[in-house]
């Protein structure tokens, strides 16, 4: 191969631009010569100029470029040299819309650290806070309901039903007070704004750190600092438990903490095996639960038998876990170092991660796969940053720096936005992310 000089500004490479984008964004497929030292920004300028020549109304936008399925993140000739591709061939460059936020929305202030977010509902965002309250935000801007009752900080919160066609929302929250609470309410009714739980779930002997909902939305599972995973029924009759009186969270105007009556439920199953805090759980398939722990392990559980069916030791205490990729077959996890790792449990005989992303500068606090893309993930870190990733490159697609302190949680919302919460007591929203 003719290596040439990677920094030689006179060297050129012949390229052909291809895309799967709709017709208005398709450049002519003829090959052209471009400078070999171009980066993706320079390549974007060329594509935009070609599109503008064909359509004067075209609005310039950034693109990313793939060669043989891998995103180009180096100057063109350096990339070719690294991959052993001849500079003499006509290089086919597939271009896609660049994945990066176009807008930072106004943050939503809270009274304490925002420790949990859920963006699985297209109309509402759910947040959990260290003030013991969960909040429902319409369009991530207006707080419509406050879910109260916990006596200590909320650590995790999830929508149970996604609410796409229903007026009623169903929510579960987990707390340092060792309990979980279930809420139901009508989103079309704004009064009362403060909502109490209809059911309290008790059984953990230490702080509940994580919660996940099964695909049928009939069950939930929780992970705790007592090292156990418990399964709970979302519904239930009074024959399954007792009605109890509990003191409501004290407020400044009512120091007595008035009592409320609600139904109490107990766990249907308990899974044992972890030796430290179960920091994250996910329930991707009806019969399979994955868990991550400060004991450095990721474990797979059979829901019916309660038995561990697979485990992997990462070497680091883990804070977060999610399943994604094709058929939700990949596992992403992060913890007490700056590296987000991805494993494929289908590969026998190896526990090495198949991808490692190492651009954060501190511990990873959360990771979530995009709901409709096999390739894209979001991560948050104690370094104050939220990063967007694509499996096809080791470099982050974008780094969002909306927070002024540690970021504790992050999620996708509506497919084109990222929501995050942190120690600066804010819910932040980065929007306009185009993933095709």
UniProtKB/Swiss-Prot annotation:
GO MF annotation, one: ribonucleoprotein complex binding
GO annotation, biological process: maturation of 5.8S rRNA from tricistronic rRNA transcript (SSU-rRNA, 5.8S rRNA, LSU-rRNA); maturation of LSU-rRNA from tricistronic rRNA transcript (SSU-rRNA, 5.8S rRNA, LSU-rRNA)
Gene3D superfamilies: YVTN repeat-like/Quinoprotein amine dehydrogenase
WD repeats: 109-147, 149-193, 203-242, 273-311, 313-353, 359-399, 402-436
A GO-annotated cellular component: preribosome, large subunit precursor
Superkingdom, taxonomy of origin: Eukaryota
PROSITE patterns: WD_REPEATS_1 (PS00678), WD_REPEATS_2 (PS50082), WD_REPEATS_REGION (PS50294)
Compartments reported by the entry: Nucleus, Nucleolus; Nucleus, Nucleoplasm
Main location: nucleus
Coiled-coil ranges (or none): none
Record bears the keyword rRNA processing: yes
SUPFAM superfamilies: WD40 repeat-like
Region of interest called Ubiquitin-like (UBL) domain, as start-end residue ranges on this chain: 13-97
UniProt region (Disordered), positions on chain: 240-262
Keywords on record: Nucleus, Repeat, Ribosome biogenesis, rRNA processing, WD repeat
PANTHER family: RIBOSOME BIOGENESIS PROTEIN WDR12 (PTHR19855:SF11), WD40 REPEAT PROTEIN 12, 37 (PTHR19855)
Function field: Required for maturation of ribosomal RNAs and formation of the large ribosomal subunit.
Family stated for the protein in its record: Belongs to the WD repeat WDR12/YTM1 family.
The protein's name: Ribosome biogenesis protein WDR12 homolog
Organism: Oryza sativa subsp. japonica (Rice)
Gene of this entry: WDR12
């Amino acid at each position: 191969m003719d290596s040439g000089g990677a920094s030689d500004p006179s060297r050129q490479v012949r390229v052909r631009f291809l895309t799967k984008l709709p017709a208005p964004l398709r450049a002519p497929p003829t090959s052209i010569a471009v400078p070999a030292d171009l980066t993706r920004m320079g390549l974007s300028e060329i594509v935009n100029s070609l599109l503008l020549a064909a359509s004067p109304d075209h609005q310039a936008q950034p693109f990313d470029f793939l060669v043989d399925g891998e995103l180009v993140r180096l100057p063109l000739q350096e990339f070719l040299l690294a991959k052993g591709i001849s500079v003499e061939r006509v290089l086919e460059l597939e271009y896609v819309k660049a994945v990066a936020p176009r807008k930072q929305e106004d943050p939503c202030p809270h009274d304490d650290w925002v420790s949990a977010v859920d963006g699985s509902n297209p109309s509402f965002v759910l947040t959990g806070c260290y003030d013991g309250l969960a909040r429902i935000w319409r369009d991530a801007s207006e707080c419509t309901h406050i879910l109260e009752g916990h006596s200590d900080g909320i650590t995790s919160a999830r929508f149970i039903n996604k609410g796409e066609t229903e007026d009623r929302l169903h929510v579960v929250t987990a707390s340092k007070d060792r309990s979980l609470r279930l809420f139901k309410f009508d989103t079309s009714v704004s009064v009362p704004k403060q909502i109490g739980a209809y059911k309290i779930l008790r059984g953990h002997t230490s702080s509940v750190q994580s919660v996940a909902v099964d695909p049928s939305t009939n069950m939930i599972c929780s992970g705790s600092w007592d090292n156990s995973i418990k399964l709970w029924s979302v519904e239930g009759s009074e024959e399954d438990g007792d009605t109890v009186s509990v003191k409501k969270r004290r407020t400044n105007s009512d120091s007595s903490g008035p009592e409320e009556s609600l139904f109490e439920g107990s766990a249907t199953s308990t899974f044992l095996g972890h030796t430290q805090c179960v920091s994250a759980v996910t329930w991707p398939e009806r019969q399979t639960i994955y868990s991550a722990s400060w004991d450095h392990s990721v474990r797979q559980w059979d829901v019916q038998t309660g038995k561990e069916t697979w485990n992997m030791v990462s070497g680091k205490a883990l804070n977060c876990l999610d399943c994604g990729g094709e058929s939700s077959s990949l596992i992403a996890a992060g913890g007490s170092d700056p590296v987000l790792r991805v494993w494929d449990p289908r590969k026998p005989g190896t526990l090495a991660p198949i991808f490692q992303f190492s651009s954060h500068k501190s511990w990873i606090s959360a990771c979530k796969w995009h709901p409709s893309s096999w390739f894209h993930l979001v991560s948050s870190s104690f370094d104050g940053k939220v990063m967007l990733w694509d499996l096809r490159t080791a470099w982050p697609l974008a780094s969002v720096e909306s927070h002024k302190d540690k970021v504790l949680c992050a999620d996708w919302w509506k497919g084109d936005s990222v929501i995050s919460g942190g120690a600066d007591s804010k819910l932040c929203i980065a929007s306009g992310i185009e993933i095709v």
